[in-house]
A protein has these predicted regions:
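Charged catalytic and DNA/RNA-contacting regions of genome-maintenance
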Residues: 2-334, 350, 354-363, 367-459, ...
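ATPase nucleotide-binding head domains, primarily ABC-like/P-loop NTPase cores
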Residues: 38-39, 233, 303-304, 314, ...
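Active-site phosphate-binding and catalytic loops of NTP-dependent enzymes
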Residues: 90, 113-122, 254, 390-396, ...
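Conserved catalytic alpha/beta cores of large enzymes that bind or transform nucleotide phosphates
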Residues: 167, 172-180, 186-189, 201, ...
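Amphipathic heptad-repeat alpha-helical coiled-coil/stalk segments that mediate oligomerization
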Residues: 207-215, 219-222, 271-274, 286, ...
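Amphipathic alpha-helical coiled-coil segments
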Residues: 325, 332, 342-348, 375, ...
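Charged, surface-exposed helical/loop "interaction arms" that form contiguous linear patches used
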Residues: 364, 368, 378-381, 399, ...
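C-terminal tails and terminal domains of large nucleic-acid-associated
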Residues: 840-875
Length: 875
């Protein structure tokens, strides 16, 4: 970077502003372009694929430079922000005609991934959160906001795992934090690389507790924190204050649209850890990260962007409060029973624009006249929606009707003031309706009639002078003038004042034309200025009503979400679940909500499920791969989750005991980036489940122990089942799929464990998966048959059958003995003891004396060979 002393005055100004904003790419306004210089130009030209040029800057070498036109800045800005850059918008803040020297410029806004308000780059159906995390001595404060909608929340928590779960739940675009969080052990590479979250630490002064409280009180205009419900969230208060400080520094505005903050406890909602969210594919699929194929894809048939975001939030945060869940059920029941009412509502909801994000544009003073028309056309629909809701008598919908403010005064203001098809620009007139403001009407008449005045003057001058082709013309340099061709210049009278001589004509003016031009041009300038001033006043009026508009937007979102749930329930034959506090999960003819959408002709096979907290805690599920075990288990988890969202469920009947958490351990994939093997990842997830599950949790465990040797894997799986089923240790309701058929022996040994399997029909050497869960354990794995179905060559299949027969003849577990209950003093053994007393082999004593911990793997292997040779010699 160059030294400022050698630079031109303009470049010195640029360098001074850049010095104060080193972490930004600076968009420096120069006329009709935003220019970038030096390193910023090198970066931006590469990322935006635009031409890199140079500019004389006072140095020997030209400064690298690139630029983008101001009218197309959003698309370029969005590209940089989506790539994780911060962009500082540097505008001219004084009229160049009034400037003495260099035009004054300032940063008016810093755009970051979490503060981008451009609707071109944002997903209408998803919030764009900026999250702040404050870490101190093992405690954490989290605060996050969507500046485009005003959604603002905070909480405090006591573990990094909970912080991780919140990050996965809300998927912020950007995280700011203190330095302590950067060394907390969070997997930042995953957050950056897999979730595309931009993460940065901010200055320590942002996290000063006293300053944080003051920022909060100023923002929400309160004298203390009690009224905001923040007193019990000290860590959240610090995070919120830091977040507000960062927003004020980057947005350079008052942020008046951030009017409320919601302090919440994670215990208010079902806890679903990050792994379970991925495995259950709540909002996006595991494979391609798309909405299609997820639970949200099935449930979201909303008509508005606000409703889509609301419904997504409901899916992300299932409830645990029975009363709140039942309220949603009642609303859905009303809307499924009253089909005409529901469809009328959806018809009126469909044209409503995104009021929340329109309000943010009003707050940021970027709302254009067409945004105002979008507001008006949306508000026109509210009275009809309020009237339709009179037919709905359930508490939730009745309450929403009462809360729905039709905003008729705002609608009338916009109806009276803004023309139906206004321009985008706000400084070039053509915005305000005739009859709204007398001064504007008079100036419009002057502008319109001025053209007639010019035509009349032109005609008079032709008659007076005899110049038949005399015309009054206009350009920006001379304004209005009389144009006389050379063939008539001898007829020009003395009172004509020459302005310009051209090859074929002369240009003149007169006193009368000058006066008329002043009137016309002055009226046009005054008209544009007065229309702009009036438009700004209208926009400020809307800004003063933000709280009312925000409440109405929230009501519309809730109505839309409830109508979507009802529509989906009716179309897919979902039923209203019953809720119980006994902990029983009783599902009749349950179906997978997503899979049944993609299977043609109602071919999905439904299944029953019964789990409780006493005699039916653990269901061990055996059966071949591809038979449907994983689909069935996910199905049960999704039905429970849907029930607690407040949605109806895919089943003939369902009675659901409210669960506090759902954990899933499904599938395996090496976490190579962090150096963890498949088995290590599996065991870490199992450890997390066993540490954090409660007796009120639902566990979905698939193939525990398959990432290691057969006996180790079986041992671990066995021990996990014993631990989970023991009410003194855990006692959680669990679906446990396994290929270890030995685990079926636990039925009868542990009262709360029962066997189930996937029914299979054998047809010679072939099998047919019936997809039906039946009682009892599978007697075969059918692995060879599955391999055949998968297309493995016949030669391999035939050889596999031979090997399978040989192994069956030497069954290693045929002598397994009874397993003692968990916790008894004696070690458990998988091998049945002989009834006859046995003599210890001499090698056993020798082996017992060996210190294996001092042996290298090679030494241990050599020792094993020695023992083997001795045994062979004995034979």
């Amino acid at each position: 970077m160059a030294k400022k002393g050698k630079l031109t005055p303009m470049m010195q100004q640029y360098m001074q502003i850049k010095e104060e904003n080193k972490d930004c790419i600076l968009f420096y306004r120069l006329g009709d372009f935003y220019e970038m210089f030096f390193d910023d130009a090198l970066t931006a030209s590469k990322e935006l694929e635009i031409t890199l040029t140079g500019k004389n800057c006072g140095l020997e070498e030209r400064a690298p430079m690139c630029g983008v036109p101001y009218h197309a800045v959003d698309s370029y800005l969005n590209k940089l922000v989506e790539k994780g850059y911060k962009v500082g918008i540097c505008e001219q803040v004084e009229d160049p005609s009034q400037a003495k020297g260099i035009v004054k410029r300032e940063i008016v806004r810093i755009v970051t991934p979490g503060t981008n308000i451009s609707q071109q780059s944002l997903d209408d159906e998803k919030n764009n959160y900026l999250m702040c995390i404050f870490a101190s001595d093992g405690s954490y404060g989290i605060s996050f906001v969507d500046v485009t909608t005003g959604d603002f929340r905070t909480t405090s928590m006591d573990s990094l795992a909970k912080v991780r779960d919140e990050i996965f739940k809300f998927e912020p675009a950007e995280i700011i934090c203190n330095d302590a969080f950067l060394i907390s052990g969070m997997d930042f590479d995953y957050l950056k690389d897999k979730m595309s979250i931009v993460i940065s630490s901010i200055e320590p002064y942002h996290f000063d507790e006293e300053q944080a409280e003051e920022r909060i009180k100023r923002q929400f205009k309160v004298g203390n924190l009690e009224g905001l419900g923040l007193v019990d969230y000290p860590m959240g208060v610090i995070a919120t204050g830091a977040l507000l400080g960062y927003l004020h520094e980057t947005q350079k505005s008052s942020l008046d649209h951030l009017m409320h903050i919601d302090a919440y406890e994670t215990s208010e909602f079902m806890i679903i850890d990050s792994s379970s969210r991925r495995n259950l594919e709540l909002c996006e699929t595991l494979r391609d990260k798309q909405k299609k194929g997820s639970l949200l894809w099935v449930l979201d048939k909303t008509k508005t962007a606000m409703g889509a975001r609301m419904l997504r939030n409901m899916v992300e945060q299932p409830l645990v409060d029975k009363k709140k869940i039942e309220e949603r059920y009642d609303a859905i029941t009303t809307l499924t029973n009253q089909t005409i009412v529901r469809e009328e509502l959806r018809e009126y909801l469909n044209p409503i624009y995104d009021l929340e994000r329109l309000m943010t544009k009003v707050s940021y003073k970027t709302a254009n006249p067409r945004d105002m028309i979008a507001f008006k056309t949306s508000l026109e629909l509210l009275p009809a929606i309020k009237t339709i809701l009179e037919e709905c008598k359930d508490p939730l919908l009745s309450g929403l009707r009462e809360d729905l403010d039709p905003l008729e005064d705002i609608h009338d203001l916009l109806e009276d003031s803004i023309i139906e098809e206004p321009p985008l620009a706000i400084k070039e007139g053509g915005i305000i309706k005739e009859g709204f403001k007398d001064d504007i009407d008079q100036l419009k008449r002057a502008k319109t009639e001025g053209k007639q005045w010019l035509m009349e003057l032109e005609e008079r001058e032709r008659e007076k002078t005899g110049i038949k082709n005399l015309k009054i013309k206009y350009n920006k340099v001379f304004g209005y003038y009389l144009d006389v061709t050379n063939s008539y210049k001898d007829l020009v009278p003395n009172y004509y004042i020459r302005k310009q001589t051209l090859a074929n004509s002369e240009r003149y003016t007169t006193e009368e034309l000058n006066q008329l031009a002043d009137t016309i041009l002055g009226s046009e300038d005054r008209l544009y200025a007065l229309e702009y001033e009036t438009y700004v006043t209208i926009r400020e009026t809307l800004a003063g009503e933000m709280e009312r508009i925000s409440r109405t937007a929230n009501v519309i979102a809730q109505i839309d979400a409830m109508a979507s749930f009802a529509y989906v329930a009716e179309r897919n034959h979902f039923v209203r679940p019953k809720l119980n506090v006994r902990g029983t999960i009783d599902i009749k003819d349950g179906r997978h909500p997503v899979v049944e959408q993609v299977i043609p002709n109602d071919m999905f096979i439904s299944n029953d499920t019964y789990l409780d907290n006493k005699k039916n805690r653990v269901a061990i599920i055996t059966g071949p791969n591809m038979a449907g075990k994983s689909t069935y288990m996910r199905q049960v988890a999704l039905i429970v989750l849907m029930a607690q969202i407040g949605s109806f469920v895919p089943a003939a009947k369902a009675n659901i005991g409210i669960v506090d958490r759902i954990f899933t351990r499904v599938g395996a994939s090496d976490d190579l980036a962090s150096g963890q093997s498949t088995f290590m990842v599996e065991m870490s997830e199992v450890a997390n489940i066993l540490r954090n599950a409660t007796k009120n949790s639902l566990l979905i465990l698939d193939e525990i122990g398959r990432g290691t040797s057969t006996f180790d894997g079986l041992s671990i799986a066995w021990a996990v089942v014993e631990y989970i089923s023991n009410s003194k240790l855990l006692g959680a309701k669990t679906l446990f799929a396994t290929h270890y058929h030995e685990l079926t022996e636990l039925e009868g040994k542990i009262d709360s464990v029962h066997n189930y399997c996937i029914a299979v029909k054998e047809q010679g050497d072939d099998i047919v998966f019936l997809r039906k869960i039946v009682k009892g354990g599978a007697d075969k794995s059918y692995g060879v048959q599955v391999a055949k179905l998968a297309g493995v060559p016949d030669a391999v299949i035939n050889r596999a059958k031979e090997i399978a027969r040989e192994l069956e003849e030497h069954d290693l577990t045929s002598g397994a003995k009874d397993i003692m209950p968990y916790g008894e003093a004696q070690q458990l053994s998988f091998f049945r003891e002989s009834d006859e007393p046995t003599m210890e082999h001499p090698f056993m004593a020798e082996l017992r004396e060996k210190d294996l911990s001092d042996m290298t793997p090679l030494e241990a292997l050599n020792y094993l060979y020695v023992l083997q040779e001795k045994l062979k010699n004995e034979e």
